[in-house]
Amino acid sequence: PRAGPQDLLSADGYLFTTPENLATMAGLMKDFFDRCYYPVLGRIEGRPYAVMVCAGSDGSGAVRQIERICTGWRLKSVAPALIVNTHAQTPEAILAPKQIPPEDLQRCRELGEALASGLALGVY
């Protein structure tokens, strides 16, 4: 099942995660925001969020898009965006399955754990 407005309403915080495609968030993530933006507008203000992006070379385009949406929702950023760079620069590398290095996976785990811990302790 796809995530939707009810999932946002029932969550205490959010970890938005997406690959970056052509300097933007992935189409499925954009679809999620398109379907959810207005149904939850005015109903989730102040909730914490963080962003993770997997990119071939940059990632900042997807981060900017998500942060603008979160600003519209009046969410509270609780960590700098985490960008995992795969350095995929050729068509073959871009289309190939990615192997994320353990240190990058650890950074992702730590961000998720920090968000979960902050929520559990009432920090956010």
Residues covered by each model-derived region:
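Helix-loop-strand module that forms the ligand-binding subsite of alpha/beta enzymes
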Residues: 3-85
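Glycine-rich phosphate/pyrophosphate-binding loop and the adjoining helix
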Residues: 3-4, 78-124
